[in-house]
Structure formats: structure tokens, C-alpha cells
């Protein structure tokens, strides 16, 4: 008769019974992590063997017979079991001490380099301080020289711009004066033409007056010659016209007409000259005021452009300073971020190691508890088998004798359920009594659950 117990992480072996004695074999394989050691034991007529390895823990088999509790080999096996158990306990104690040492180191590290620590990284940078001060002094001196050169360059550029603006202003003023001179030349040409026209008219009138005077003299001479002759002509005619009076009247009329023309021409000339002089004066005043206003506006524009250039230079200098400051702070921020990342990496590594040590410690504690429970179970089994062995021995007597008296065997089977991490979930003990009357015949049975 045989039976096999199976579970997710355990295996129970077989139980063998024989007539001279009772043999009980049980195998229990537990999928729990171990520390790489093994154990085996034997009690009296029973033998117990087991092993604890990295892959799991296995509990061997034990045999009960009627020859007593401990034989020579069984004592050695028991001693081996005790030695291995002591070694296991020493290993557990060593691991606990190592874990405590590691926890103390972690605590010391947190006290020295933790977020609340005032020491920070325990590095001595005092030997670098003179070098840093020297480099800082050189950087400040180079920055000042660079700023001085930039300022000189800006001043030279502003001076060149100032001279360029002055040249442009003088050139514009020169062109304006040339334009005014050309305008005045055109006016002068017009006045010259008008004067020439008036002179031509004056000459024409003078010639006409001379011609009239000459005609008048000739007529007067002809009349005087005619009056001085001896010719007497008597005519009974109407009284004639007095030519002298007529000539005098004509002369007076022509003189009045010439005088009137002269006065009209002189008045027209004076009027035109006055209007032209007034226009020239007005244009000159307007030109002067416009020129003054243009000069003032150009001067204001030049001043504003100089201020704009200075403000642009100041803006550029401030932008350069801002860029340099931002670069320095970005570099410092990157260094601080790198230090923070390194510290976080160290902290993560320490936490990982701590969690690994904690997990290993919990596994060892679970293995320890499991082994202690197995040892207690084996002690219970050994206690029950001892009574069975004493009873069988009293009935059979010493030695291996063949009798037909009935034998009683008590078989205890421990069934344990384990989780994947090796922790015991439940434990059950099955007890079975069997009687056998056969002599020297070994019956191999597998006990049902």
C-alpha cells in the first residue's frame, strides 16, 4: 500500500514497514532559499537525513527499528546534525552581525552626508583656494580689460559717427547755401533783364525825343526863313492858325507825354524793385529761419543719435554681462545637479543594498523558523517513535527473533504548505497505527493522506 502527497512546493516520500522493526521514510522538499549547508540525523532505531541548499531545503528520511534509540552510526549522524545546526546558527548570527554592521554604516553615512548634515562632502579643498582666488583675479582683470577695450571701441565708433554726422550736416548746409545762391542768381538775372529792358525803353524814348526836337528846330528854321523874304502876298483869306502856338502846344503835349512816360516807367521800376526787394527780404528771412531751424533740428538729431548709440552700447554691455552671469549660474547649477544626481545614485544604491540585505535577512529568518519547526516536528516524531520502539522491544525481546506475535507501528506524517518565498502557511500531522503478524517479511506500504 502506498500513497504520495504532492503540493505546489513540497514532496512527501514513502513509508516502509518491516516485521522485525518499523521503518519510516519521509521526504519533504521545500522551495525556500538557504545558505548552502545540509544536515542529517538519526535517533535510536530511526535515521533522519536532510539537506539545505541554495535552491531549496530538503528533509530526508528517518527509520525506526526495535534495536534501541541510538546506535554507533546514528550517534555520529546525530553529532553531524548538531554540528551542522550549530554551523547554521553561527552563519545566521554572522549574517545578523553583518547586517547590523551595514545598518550602522548606513546610519553613519546618513549622519555625515545626509540631507540634514552640515558637513556635506568631507573633502578638503583648502589647497585649491589660492588657485581659485588667482584664477578669479585673472578672470576679473581680463573682464575689466575686455570691458575697457569694448568701451574704447564704442567711443571710437561713436566719435566716427559724430564726425560723419557733422560732415553730413556741413555737406547739407553747403548744398543748401549753393541752392540759395543759385536762386539768388536767377533773381539777379531776372532783375538784370528787367533793367536792360527799361534801359532800352529809355533809349528809345530819348531817341524819339531827340528826333522830335530836331524836327521842331527844322520847322522853326524853315518858318523863320520864309518870314525873312521880300515876297508880299496879300490874300483875302480867313485868319490862319498860329503855328508857333500850335508848335508850342505840341511841344508841351509831347514833353508832358514824355514826362508822363518817364514817371510811369520810373514808378513801375520803383514798384517792381520794391516788390522784388520785399520778396528777396522775405525769402531771405524765411531761408534764414528755415536754415536755423534745420540746423537746430540736425543738432537735436545728432544729440539724440549719440544718446541712442550710447544707450545701445550700454544695452549690449549689459546683455553681455547678463549672458556671462547666466552662463556662470548655469554652470554652477549643472555642477549642483550633477552632485545631487551622484548623491541620489549613491542613496539609491544604498537603499537597494539595504533592501537586498533586508530581503536576505527575512529569507534567513524564514528558513530559521522553518528549520526550528521541522526540528520540533522531528522531536515530536522521535518522541512518538521512541514509545513505539520500546513497546516493540518489550514484546520481541533482544536480537532479531522470528515470532508470530503481532507488531504495532505508529506512523506520523507531517504535511506542510509553503509559499514561494519559503514561509510555512499551514502544517498538518497524520497518525496511522498498523499491526503486522508476518515474520521476517518486509511489507512496503505507501500511506494514503
From Swiss-Prot:
Record note on quaternary structure: Heterotetramer of two type I and two type II keratins. Interacts with KRT6A to form filaments.
Pfam family, one: Filament
Sequence segments annotated as region (Tail): 386-449
Keywords: Coiled coil, Cytoplasm, Intermediate filament, Keratin
Location, primary (coarse class): cytoplasm
Gene transcribed to yield this protein: Krt27
Record keyword Repeat present: no
Superkingdom classification of source: Eukaryota
Region (Coil 1A): 74-109
Region annotation (Disordered) ranges: 425-449
Chain segments carrying region Linker 12: 224-246
General remark: There are two types of cytoskeletal and microfibrillar keratin: I (acidic; 40-55 kDa) and II (neutral to basic; 56-70 kDa).
A GO molecular function held by the record: structural molecule activity
Gene Ontology biological-process entries: epithelial cell differentiation; hair follicle morphogenesis; intermediate filament organization
Organism, as annotated: Rattus norvegicus (Rat)
IF rod domain: residues covered: 74-389
Region described as Coil 2: 247-385
Region (Linker 1): 110-131
Biased composition, class Basic and acidic residues, residue ranges: 430-449
Protein name according to UniProt: Keratin, type I cytoskeletal 27
Function of the protein: Essential for the proper assembly of type I and type II keratin protein complexes and formation of keratin intermediate filaments in the inner root sheath (irs).
Amino acid at each position: 500500500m502506498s500513497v504520495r502527497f504532492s503540493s505546489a512546493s513540497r514532496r512527501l516520500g514513502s513509508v516502509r514497514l518491516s516485521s522485525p522493526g518499523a521503518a519510516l521514510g519521509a521526504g519533504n522538499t521545500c522551495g525556500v532559499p538557504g545558505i548552502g549547508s545540509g544536515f542529517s540525523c538519526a535517533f535510536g532505531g530511526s535515521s533522519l537525513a536532510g539537506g539545505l541548499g541554495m535552491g531549496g531545503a530538503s528533509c530526508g528520511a528517518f527509520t525506526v527499528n526495535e534495536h534501541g534509540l541510538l546506535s554507533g552510526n546514528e550517534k555520529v549522524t546525530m553529532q553531524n546534525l548538531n554540528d551542522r545546526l550549530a554551523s547554521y546558527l553561527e552563519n545566521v548570527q554572522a549574517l545578523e552581525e553583518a547586517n547590523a554592521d551595514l545598518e550602522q554604516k548606513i546610519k553613519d553615512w546618513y549622519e555625515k552626508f545626509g540631507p540634514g548634515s552640515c558637513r556635506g562632502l568631507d573633502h578638503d579643498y583648502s589647497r585649491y583656494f589660492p588657485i581659485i582666488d588667482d584664477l578669479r583675479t585673472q578672470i576679473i582683470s581680463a573682464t575689466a580689460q575686455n570691458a575697457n577695450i569694448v568701451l574704447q571701441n564704442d567711443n571710437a565708433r561713436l566719435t566716427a559717427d559724430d564726425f560723419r554726422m557733422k560732415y553730413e550736416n556741413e555737406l547739407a548746409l553747403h548744398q543748401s547755401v549753393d541752392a540759395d545762391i543759385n536762386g539768388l542768381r536767377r533773381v539777379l538775372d531776372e532783375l538784370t533783364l528787367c533793367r536792360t529792358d527799361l534801359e532800352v525803353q529809355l533809349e528809345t524814348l530819348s531817341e524819339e525825343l531827340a528826333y522830335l526836337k530836331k524836327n521842331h528846330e527844322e520847322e522853326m528854321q524853315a518858318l523863320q526863313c520864309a518870314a525873312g523874304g521880300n515876297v508880299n502876298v496879300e490874300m483875302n483869306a480867313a485868319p490862319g492858325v498860329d503855328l508857333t502856338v500850335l508848335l508850342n502846344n505840341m511841344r508841351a503835349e509831347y514833353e508832358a507825354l514824355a514826362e508822363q512816360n518817364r514817371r510811369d516807367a520810373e514808378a513801375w521800376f520803383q514798384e517792381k524793385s520794391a516788390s522784388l526787394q520785399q520778396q528777396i527780404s522775405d525769402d531771405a528771412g524765411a531761408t534764414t529761419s528755415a536754415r536755423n531751424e534745420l540746423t537746430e533740428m540736425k543738432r537735436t538729431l545728432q544729440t539724440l543719435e549719440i544718446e541712442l548709440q550710447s544707450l545701445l552700447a550700454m544695452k549690449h554691455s549689459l546683455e553681455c554681462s547678463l549672458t556671462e552671469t547666466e552662463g556662470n549660474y548655469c554652470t554652477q547649477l549643472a555642477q549642483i545637479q550633477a552632485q545631487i544626481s551622484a548623491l541620489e545614485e549613491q542613496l539609491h544604491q544604498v537603499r537597494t543594498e539595504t533592501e537586498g540585505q533586508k530581503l536576505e535577512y527575512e529569507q534567513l529568518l524564514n528558513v530559521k523558523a522553518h528549520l526550528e519547526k521541522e526540528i520540533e516536528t522531528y522531536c515530536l516524531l522521535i518522541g512518538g517513535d521512541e514509545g513505539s520502539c520500546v513497546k516493540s522491544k518489550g514484546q520481541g525481546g533482544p536480537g532479531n527473533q522470528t515470532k508470530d506475535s503481532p507488531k504495532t507501528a505508529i506512523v506520523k506524517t507531517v504535511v506542510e504548505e509553503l509559499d514561494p518565498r519559503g514561509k510555512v502557511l499551514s502544517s498538518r500531522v497524520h497518525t496511522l497505527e498498523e499491526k503486522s503478524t508476518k515474520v521476517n517479511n518486509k511489507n512496503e506500504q505507501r500511506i494514503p493522506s
